[in-house]
Amino acid sequence: MFVKTGDKVKVIAGSEKGKEGTVLSVNVKENRVVVKGVNMIKKATKASASNANGGVVETEGSIHASNVKVIAKAESNKD
């Protein structure tokens, strides 16, 4: 896959078009990436030992890899 964890990317298609962020994770099997600060979704969580109150948590959702363009490679990925 052309994008790796840690790369800085720009979203080139979809509702988040124009946003930039760092790749947090890559799912090679489904050809999807999770970009920091892009495609934020709200998820309801139950109360637990680590989260006493529970409630709504905002987290990044995945987007298809074809919707992003690499701006800068991560330092460890420069080949």
Swiss-Prot record:
GO MF terms held by the record: rRNA binding; structural constituent of ribosome
Record keywords: Ribonucleoprotein, Ribosomal protein, RNA-binding, rRNA-binding
SMART domains membership: KOW
GO aspect biological process, one term: translation
Record carries keyword Transcription: no
Pfam family, one: ribosomal_L24
Gene Ontology cellular-component annotations: ribonucleoprotein complex; ribosome
Signal sequence, start to end: none
Domain of life of the native organism: Bacteria
InterPro entries: KOW, Rib_uL2_dom2, Ribosomal_uL24, Ribosomal_uL24_CS, Ribosomal_uL24_KOW, Translation_prot_SH3-like_sf
UniProt keyword annotation of rRNA-binding present: yes
Binding partners and assembly: Part of the 50S ribosomal subunit.
Protein family membership: Belongs to the universal ribosomal protein uL24 family.
Function recorded in the entry: One of two assembly initiator proteins, it binds directly to the 5'-end of the 23S rRNA, where it nucleates assembly of the 50S subunit. One of the proteins that surrounds the polypeptide exit tunnel on the outside of the subunit.
Name of this chain's protein: Large ribosomal subunit protein uL24
Organism for this UniProt entry: Lactobacillus delbrueckii subsp. bulgaricus (strain ATCC 11842 / DSM 20081 / BCRC 10696 / JCM 1002 / NBRC 13953 / NCIMB 11778 / NCTC 12712 / WDCM 00102 / Lb 14)
